[in-house]
Structure formats: C-alpha cells, structure tokens
C-alpha cells in the first residue's frame, strides 16, 4: 500500500469553528502546522467566493481567538498560537485607516489658521506705519472719572444746607429735632458701659484707667483687663485719650452758649425765636455727630512721631482707616481737611439734577433724611445702614443713579 509522504508527516487535524462578521458559521479543518495566513485564505474562500482575486484582500482581514480575545499573527502556525480542537475563531475585516490629507487640504487648513490668528506687534506696526501719530493724554482721561464716595461728601454738605432751610419752614420741626437731640443724648457712643466699668473697678482697677481701657478696647472687658495689666507700669497710663478732654471742654462751652442764646432768643419775635431755636438744635446735633478719631489709631500714629492734630485730621480724611491715614500723612495730604467741609457747586449740572428729582425733593422735607446726611457726613461707614432704611434708602439710591449717569456722559 502506497501512502503519500506529506500525509505520513502531517500534524494533528483540528476542527475549528469559524464565525464571520455577517453571522455565517462553519467548521474549518486544518493541521497544527498550518499557518494562520493559510487558514485565513481557506476561510475567505469558504465565506466570500472570489474575494481572493484581490491579493490585498487577505491582508485586510484578521482572525481573532474568541476565548482569549487575541489577534492571531499571520506568520505563526496554529500550534504556535496554541489553538486547540473545537476552538472558536472570528474572521473580521480590518478597520481601514483614514486616508492622509492631501497637500492642498493641509495648505488650506494652515491658511485658515493663519487668517484667524491675532496680529502680533510687528504686524500692527506694519499696518499702521502710514497712519498719522495721535498722542492721548491718558492721565487726563482717567481723572475725569470722579469717585462717588469723594463727591458724595460734597453733595451731602450742600444737601444738608438745603434741608435745613426747608425744615426751618416746618412748624413742627423744632419738636421733631428736640426728640432727635434727646435720642442722641441717650445713645451717645462715648458713654462707657457701666456694667463693664463696675466689673473692672471691682477687680481693683481705678475708674479712670478702667474707662480708658474700655474705650480703647471697644467696651470688651477681657481685652480691657489685659490692656490694664500690660500697661500697669506705663507712666502714660493716666494720660487722657487724645481728643477726649477737648471734647469734654467743647461740650461744656456748647452748653453755656446754648443757655445764653436761649436767653437772648426770649426777647425776639416768635418766628425768629423758633428759627433760632432750630438753628441751635442743628448745632447741637452737629456737635454730637462730630468726628471721633479711633483712639488706638491715634496712639499708634503719634508713636510714629506725628502731631496729634495732624493724626486726627488724617483719620478724619480717611474715615478712621489707620493705614490710609499713615499714607496720607507721608504723602501730599490731599484732600485737605478744609476741603471736606466744602459743598458741591450749586450751579453744577449734577447738583441741579439731584434737586430736580422728585424723590430727593420729598426726602429733604423729612427730618430723618437730614439726620442721615449728618451721620454719613461724619461716619461714611454708616452709609450702608442708611441705604437699607425704607425712608432714606430711596433718596440715596436716586443720588447714586444720577451721579453714575452724569459721570458716564
């Protein structure tokens, strides 16, 4: 019996389950020494007739071992890929890579990017080389924009004068401002908390020192006690706070002048008496609302070598802000304290627009508005409180809107 040589040395025959991408399934027989590429050709003959006419078709497909999800290498045999009998292989067409862009497309894309690119400094200079030079005074442009907080003080000074004249015509104004004056007497900031003062005196501290410590530490007993202990050996501990003694003297002088003026008013006509009394109340309110420098800031700045009057002026100009006051003292000292009491030009478009506003006109006849203006004039940090007040808030809002509108135009 004659047996072919290749069959004598042939490897083990494996039965493999082949699955195509279109869902077709069949059994393919191959020996262990068959290459993956030969197996793929056989599968393509079975699955797609005539597909081998294109020699590149074999390279466009791949076999995947389903169990291990491995792509089989064309150069290896079935044995080398560790394929077993009854294994499942997937015949899948390879994903065609996207074609490279043509040179024309690349050039068009680059050109588009260049067109969208912002010009650099050299390009701007080249494009504007033939244009006439135009110099702009940027400093002058910036200074034309006025700061609202700076202008607000001038506006308030002028509006207070207008409000005083309007309220002097109100027959009930004297009684209204007497009540306001009494409220200020009850709610004065300089008054020391009696409970806190008693706690410190019961600990053995002298009353004068305890009062000074409480004023310096915003009526906080623990901080005041700590300050008294730290400064117990300080020779200046009994020195009155800057401006405190002066304020007491001013209050006494004010009381004397008030008494004498009331005696003089008694000899006047009733209308003049009422007007003078109202003027006197205005003065009292102004004195009680006058600026009070932060004692800690005064001491800190005086320790730097500045005079007490200069320090108080600096804190008044800068709303009790110590750092800003220090910069003011070291700088050109603008604005000056005298400028703070100057009102806005009564003939200016801004002031005329404010006075023509109906909301402002109505608010100026309200005594509470005058008190609010006085308070904001001496304590600018209280502006937020009055902006949220239902009576004074609308007036302040209209003033702000008018200022912003005219400032932009």
Curated annotation (Swiss-Prot):
Biased composition (Low complexity): 245-268
Consequence recorded when altering residue 269 to A: In strain: Czech II
Domain STI1: 357-396
All copies of domain UBA, residue ranges: 187-231, 292-332
InterPro entries assigned to the protein according to its UniProt record, in alphabetical order: STI1_HS-bd, UBA, UBA-like_sf, UBA1_UBAC1, UBA2_UBAC1, UBAC1, Ubiquitin-like_domsf
Residues recorded with modification N-acetylmethionine: 1
Entry superkingdom: Eukaryota
An individual GO BP term: protein ubiquitination
Segments forming domain Ubiquitin-like: 14-98
Subcellular location, record wording: Cytoplasm
Pfam families with a match to the protein in the record: UBA_7, UBL_UBAC1
Gene Ontology CC, one term: cytosol
Pathway: Protein modification; protein ubiquitination
Biased composition (Basic and acidic residues): 108-122
Stretches assigned to coiled coil: none
GO molecular function terms attached to this record: polyubiquitin modification-dependent protein binding; proteasome binding
Matches recorded under PROSITE patterns: UBA
Outcome of swapping residue 252 to G: In strain: Czech II
Keywords attached to this entry: Acetylation, Cytoplasm, Repeat, Ubl conjugation pathway
Annotated stretches, region: Disordered: 101-122, 239-273
Transcription keyword on record: no
Keyword flag Acetylation: yes
UniProt comment concerning the protein's domains: The UBA domains recognize and bind polyubiquitinated proteins.
Role summary: Non-catalytic component of the KPC complex, a E3 ubiquitin-protein ligase complex that mediates polyubiquitination of target proteins, such as CDKN1B and NFKB1. The KPC complex catalyzes polyubiquitination and proteasome-mediated degradation of CDKN1B during G1 phase of the cell cycle. The KPC complex also acts as a key regulator of the NF-kappa-B signaling by promoting maturation of the NFKB1 component of NF-kappa-B by catalyzing ubiquitination of the NFKB1 p105 precursor.
Subunit structure: Component of the KPC complex composed of RNF123/KPC1 and UBAC1/KPC2. Interacts (via ubiquitin-like domain) with RNF123. Interacts (via ubiquitin-like and UBA domains) with the proteasome via its N-terminal domain.
Protein name (database record): Ubiquitin-associated domain-containing protein 1
Source species of the chain: Mus musculus
